[in-house]
Structures are given as structure tokens and as C-alpha cells.
Amino acid sequence: MSSSFKSTLKVWAYLTDDIREDLLLESELVLLSFATGIQDAASWSDYGCFASNQTGNGLFLAIGAAKLEGSAYSLSHVGMSSLGAFLAGGWAVGQIGNLVGVRKRLWLVASSAFQTALVYAAAAIQYNLPIPQGSPAALAGIFLLAFSSGAQVALGRSLKITDITTAMATAAFIDVVADPDVLKIQNRQRNRRVIFLLMLVAGCFVGAFAQAAVNSTFIIILCAVCKTIVTFAFLTNKPIEKLRR
């Protein structure tokens, strides 16, 4: 067997390893949570809906349908582009992950790279085209961001680190305050939830202030940069130790 073939086998074995749950994996999910906060600050200000917070979008959809705020909340943005794309992204990545192995390194890298590419594409649309609400460019932008968000949440949930959802904060807030061991010094679950919430909220603040100081294109690129870091970081995660026979 040639040395080049052996090297290829080693690389393939490395890429098909199942990665383990550790501090690095948790840190990657926390960084994705930060990116989510940044992204939703941009999507709300430009599109009048969220790319990730579908609970909020459900409320906006009802308000818009009842005409409580006139045409402030668009069915095309909230219902078709954001909620629909979010579900489509979650379904696609969730089901493919079930088939190929949700912890496979190659799957995590490829899926994360795809999600990141969608965010960069949304930034390109934002930079090059006008995006009045209801325009094709606006619908395309929110579709890309929401599809990427749904895929990200599905990827994160499939890793079974339920304390870090990368997007939804409501349950995490209650999990923290209702934890019977909330005041214990050593409480890994509480710590993960608190860090997740802090990073998600911090991302929202960063996105909001960056929107005020620069523009939404910059915010979306910043989100994409965070996701790029995570994509490459997946290459460094340690594998689950295989049992020796």
C-alpha cells in the first residue's frame, strides 16, 4: 500500500470521525449564538421580521393578519420567506444529518460552510441591490438568512447539547431560574445556559449598535465571519474515543 494512499485513508478517517462533546464544541455553538443575535438585529431593521426568532415572527404574522399595525408586518416576509425558509433549512439539514451522521466531522464542516455561504450571499444582495420591503431582493435576502438559521438550529439540536440552542432564548431563561441547583457553584448546565443567553443578547446589542454606526451589510458580514470561524474550528474538534477490542 503506497504512502499516498495511506495518507488519503487517514484523512478520510479523520473527516468521518464522530466528534465528541467538549468545551470546544460548546464554544463553537456559543459563537453561533452570538452570530444569531447579530443577524437578527440586521434582519429586523431591514426586513421587519427575524431570521431566527420564529416565535416573534408568529406573533408578527398574527398582528399583520389582524391589521393591527397596518402593513408593518408583511405576510411575504414573515410567513413565506422567513418562517417557510427556516423550516425548509431545518428540515433539509436535519434529515440529511440523520442519514449521514449528525456528529461526522465532514458533515459538520460541509453543512456549516453551506450555511455560511448563504449568509455571505445575503450580504452581497444587501450591498448591491436596493431592498425595499416586498421587493424580490428583500425576499431573497431574508430567505437566505432564514434558511441558514433553520439549518444552523437543526445542526445544533442534533448534537444533543440542549442547553445551547443557538437561537431560542425563552426556554433557556426559564431553565436557568427554575433550576433547583441554580445557586450551586458547580453547575455545568446552568453555566452553559447563562453563557448562551449572554452571548445571544450580546450579539443583539453588537448588531444593533453596528447597524446604527455602520450599516446592515456590515452586520451580516460580521455574522458570516463568526460562522466562518466555527466552520474551520470543526476541523479541530477531537473525536469520540473508539472502544478497543
Regions from the PLM with identified roles:
Residues 165-182:
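Cytosolic, membrane-interface loops and tails of multi-pass inner-membrane proteins
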Residues 2-167, 188-204, 208-244:
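Alpha-helical transmembrane segments and their membrane-interface boundaries
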